[in-house]
Amino acid sequence: MKNQIHNYDFLIVGAGLVGSLLALSLIKKKFKVKIIEKHHQILKDQRTLAINANSKDFLNQIGIWNKIKTQPEVINRIIIQDHLDNNQKLVFENREEPMGHVAYNYEIQEIVRSKLLKLKCMIGGINLNQDNIKANEIIVLNKSRYLFKKIIFATGKNANFSKGFSKKTFPTKHKSYVGFFSHSKNHQNIAYEIFTKNGPLAVLPAPSKKKNYSTFIFSTLEPYSIPEQLKILEKNFQGSHGAIKLKKKIFEFSLNPHLTKTKLENIILLGDSLRSMHPVAGQGWNLGIKDIQTLCDLTDLYDFRSNYFDEIYYAKRQLESVAYLGMTSMINYVYDHPNFFNHFIIRTSFKALQKFKPLRNLFIKQAMGRGYTFV
């Protein structure tokens, strides 16, 4: 029928990995879901994901983990180090289970999108004005008319909202460089975060049977050429990783830390649309998974159509979002503004984590996604 209206529970705008995983999770709970994306094909993102223990459990529960083509690389230990006080160092590990894994973003996205296409719930090539997408009002998708009870935006950190949204930004002049390098020594399944004089440099073991391949994220105030990035990697990792050969393809990203709110009814923000942070924490994607888990858990407890459902969701995600944004902003500030007071804060923080076991255990659990549940 030409004027038929299709009634659905959820419309998810944005078929990136977080939005797609939410769609799959809600469908498994028997909700009627459509997910729309402006692109027809997956953008082949060659980057990796740092997947903490909680996110790995989630991917396992929805039937994704064991289907990943390239076996994810294990993270057994995390080393945090800085250039102050003779390269003071923190070492974190958990003997009960891996602290995390590293997998290729694109491989997980392919699995999820294949499932969604088979379920006929995804529509590509749709580019609607986000301000005109409203719940309980007719939305036309490919000439068909739909009504959705709830709208979920998972359109990423650069989403442009205007009416009914407030966006708190945390300005930073940092830009991030992401790339890969091969090395002559075994990486020993160790992840590193080194606070260099030039900015935070993270190196993670990348999926590879020979264990001689790693990925890096370097965030800095100044532009760096490929030879300059190689020089920084060699300075900090030649001892642990041996001879380093940098891959030519380097990705460059501007950073846009923010926390966005809305009081519009039946509108949910998810993942980087809700909050985006500096990659120094390495937890942005994992927080998106927690958004999914929180929302799905709430559908078991409350009517998702009720006025208070959105308020409860935002209340549960607000504290963790603010905590991570505040922490990453503070870390960047004290390193970007070297002085006696900021050096004192850094030294004190390192010593506290070195000496107090309960604090170390809390840090480990939080990094693994097994920490305090924010309510």
What are the language-model segments listed below?
Residues V13, S25-R47:
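Glycine-rich FAD pyrophosphate-binding loop
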Residues Y224-N307:
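FAD/FMN-dependent oxidoreductases across multiple families
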Residues G19-S20:
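N-terminal Rossmann-fold NAD(P) dinucleotide-binding loop
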Residues K2-G16:
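Beta1/beta-strand and adjacent pyrophosphate-binding region of the FAD-binding site
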Residues H40-N60:
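Conserved N-terminal glycine-rich FAD pyrophosphate-binding loop of Rossmann-like flavoproteins
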Residues S144-R145, K150-I250:
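Conserved FAD-binding catalytic core of PHBH/FMO-like flavoproteins
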Residues D297-V375:
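C-terminal helical "tail/cap" subdomain of flavin- and related membrane-associated enzymes
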Residues I5, D57-Q61, P72-K163, F170-V178:
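Conserved N-terminal helical subregion
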